[in-house]
Amino acid sequence: MEGPAFPDKEASMHFTSGVNRPPYEAGSAFLQVTSGCSHAACLFCGYFKDTCFRKSPLEEIEADVKEIPRIFGTPERVFLQSADAFAADYGTLMKTAELIRRHVPSVKSIGGYARIDNFFGKSAEQIRAMKDAGFLNPYIGVESGDDAVLKAVRKGYTAAEARAQLEKLTEAGMPFIANFLNGIGGAGFGLSHARKTAGLYEGMSVSMIEVSSLTLVPGTPLFRLREKGKFREAGEHERLREMQEFLRRLANETVFLSDHVSVPFRVRARLPEQKQELVDGIQRLLDGIPEEELRRHRDAHPIM
């Protein structure tokens, strides 16, 4: 997640939490449908701690939709705000899509960040209707498929619950973007985290997997646990071996994207065609770059 950013040109729209987006959504228009995070309990997250969760009223959403052409021109995609925009109820999301079609006809698709539990109350039929209305590739912050890790960082759901929701999206024909949070389990948890997360995604319609690497943010509970000696970070080489194992185990036809500053290399690759090339490239990093140099890269980019 990048942000919060709050460009001056967007000041006439409602962005209570600023604008938060993945790097690849830089060319999208932005529209707030929620503020803050509906969960706000993940131990590693430093975002939205000062923003109470709120669902935007439809009249506010409509006013902002009408501003999109003036501020963003003729965008082809809208990326909904904020931390988990799909926490908005089905009716609100469908009405939002209708408003976008009416006032911003250039838009071809609608995305946004989502949590697994945002889909608990939405049926496969509703998700299929959302896809037909223009929703495509929501970015789901799954983080891990390892129950021990999910529980330790208080994600708020189990791997089985995550799989059930991803299966629902797949059944509904809704492709999605998911992530792999490298190092989230801390020292010693990497290989289990890698294997179980790759297994979670098997058979799912995941169109892209974006990788980022855990960076402890001052003020977060996980940062304080490290300061007290109750959490031990994975080393840089351990993280690379973890990512290597994730790639080896991943069976999906998908795009693997590393574009986050927390990761020491940038790549966009098609899997499985370029899998071995990635695995070999990571091995060259392991063989050629000392732990200390990789750590300096992390310390120079202190964001999650």
Model-derived regions, located:
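Conserved, mostly hydrophobic/aromatic
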Residues: 37, 45, 61, 80, ...
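Conserved strand-turn element in the central/C-terminal portion of the radical SAM core barrel
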Residues: 117, 141, 145-149, 169-193, ...
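Auxiliary Fe-S-binding modules of radical SAM enzymes
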Residues: 2-25, 104, 202-304
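Hydrophobic faces of well-ordered beta-strands that scaffold small-molecule active sites
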Residues: 29-31, 76-78, 108-114, 138-140, ...
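Aromatic/hydrophobic pocket-lining residues that form the small-molecule binding cavity
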Residues: 61, 93, 123, 162, ...
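Canonical Radical SAM [4Fe-4S] cluster-binding loop centered on the CxxxCxxC motif
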Residues: 16-60
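Catalytic cores of alpha/beta
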Residues: 125-127, 186-203
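Conserved SAM/AdoMet-binding glycine-rich loop
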Residues: 69-172, 251
